[in-house]
C-alpha cells in the first residue's frame, strides 16, 4: 500500500489526509499542535455549519473525522526531509519514511511585539481584515501594518 506523510494539521493538511486515506493510501499526519485556526474565536463562513463555530472546535471535529476514516496523527515537529530509496520526514525523536510527502504547514505572519497581544487574538485582535471585518461593522477599529497589503484594506 502506498504511504504518505502530511506535515501540518490545519485545513489544508486535514483535507489532503481525507482524500489520501479515502483513496486507499496509508496516511499519517505530523502535527506540532494547534495552529492559527485554533485561535479563531468565531467562524461563521464555513460550509456545513448553521451556527458559528470556534476555530478550536472546527479543528477538533476535522481531526476526529480524519481519525474515524483511518488517518494516524503523530505529535512531532518535522525538522528535516531526505530522499534515498524513499522520502523520509525527520523529527527529533523518529524518522517517518513515505512514498510521498505533503507540506501543509500554514502561513506565518509578522506579529508586533506588544505586551498582552497574544491573549487578545480571537478576542478583538484579528490578522485578516477580509475574514473578520464583518464582526467589527459599525465599530471603531485601529489598523496596524505596512506595505502593499495594508493599502488594500
Language model features: what each stretch is:
Residues 7-12, 47, 54, 105, ...:
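Short glycine-rich loop/turn motifs that provide flexible caps or phosphate-binding loops at active sites
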Residues 20-22, 42-45, 88, 115-119:
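Short, glycine/charged-enriched secondary-structure capping and boundary segments
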Residues 1-5, 73-139:
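FAD-binding core/adjacent interface of flavoenzyme oxidoreductases
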Residues 10, 42, 77, 107-108, ...:
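A generic "binding-loop/recognition-motif" signal
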Residues 3-29, 121, 128-153:
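Rossmann-like dinucleotide/flavin-binding elements
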Residues 38-95:
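N-terminal Rossmann-like dinucleotide/flavin-binding domain of flavoprotein oxidoreductases
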Residues 34-36:
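Helix N-cap at the beta1-alpha1 junction of Rossmann-like dinucleotide-binding domains, i.e.
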Amino acid at each position: 500500500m502506498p504511504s504518505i506523510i502530511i506535515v501540518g494539521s490545519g485545513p489544508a493538511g486535514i483535507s489532503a489526509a481525507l482524500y489520501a486515506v479515502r483513496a486507499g493510501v496509508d496516511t499519517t499526519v505530523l502535527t506540532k499542535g494547534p495552529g492559527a485556526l485554533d485561535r479563531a474565536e468565531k467562524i461563521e463562513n464555513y460550509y456545513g455549519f448553521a451556527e458559528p463555530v470556534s476555530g478550536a472546535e472546527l479543528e477538533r471535529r476535522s481531526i476526529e473525522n480524519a481519525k474515524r476514516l483511518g488517518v494516524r496523527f503523530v505529535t512531532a515537529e518535522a525538522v528535516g526531509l531526505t530522499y534515498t530509496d524513499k522520502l523520509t520526514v525527520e523529527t527529533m525523536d523518529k524518522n517517518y519514511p513515505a512514498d510521498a510527502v505533503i507540506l501543509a504547514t500554514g502561513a506565518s505572519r509578522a506579529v508586533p511585539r506588544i505586551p498582552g497581544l497574544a491573549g487578545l487574538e480571537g478576542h478583538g485582535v484579528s490578522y485578516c481584515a477580509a475574514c473578520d471585518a464583518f464582526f467589527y461593522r459599525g465599530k471603531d477599529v485601529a489598523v496596524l501594518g505596512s506595505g502593499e497589503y495594508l493599502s488594500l484594506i
